[in-house]
Swiss-Prot record:
Transmembrane segments: none annotated. GO terms for molecular function: DNA binding; protein heterodimerization activity; structural constituent of chromatin. This is Histone H2B.6. It comes from Triticum aestivum. Keywords: Acetylation, Chromosome, DNA-binding, Nucleosome core, Nucleus. One of its GO terms (cellular component) is nucleus. Its main location: nucleus.
Length: 121
């Protein structure tokens, strides 16, 4: 008869909350908003005007929704053209697809102006 294999001792499983164990805190998710930028634009339009926190929250949500739509459409365009990078061209095309008529034209011209201003400095 062959000798029996040795039994290994059971390994204790670590259970959270045991003594001597340091618990890792869950990392905070950064919650970035556009509130300061919305406020700056508001002050450019009318320095005496104010905005309620509820209105600020609504405008911030609108901007986040638009950003998600444009990012998603840009990603689809990049995938469709088999490109690994989203360039200004994909973003410009996404703006034309997402925004209606005249709004798209103005958005494209303002975006082009901003990119030109950014690349000059």
């Amino acid at each position: 008869m062959a000798p029996k294999a040795e039994k290994k001792p059971k390994v204790e499983k670590r259970v959270p909350g045991k003594e001597g164990e340091t618990s890792k805190k869950k990392a905070k998710k950064s919650n970035e908003t556009y509130k300061i930028y919305i406020f700056k634009v508001l002050k450019q339009i009318d320095p005496n005007m104010g905005i309620s926190s509820k209105s600020m929250s609504i405008i911030n949500s609108i901007i986040n929704d638009i950003f998600e739509k444009l990012a998603g459409e840009s990603a689809k365009l990049a995938r469709y053209n088999k490109k690994p990078t989203i360039t200004s061209r994909e973003i410009q095309t996404a703006v034309r697809l997402v925004f209606p008529g005249e709004l798209a034209k103005h958005a494209v011209s303002e975006g082009t102006k901003a990119v030109t201003r950014f690349t000059v400095y």
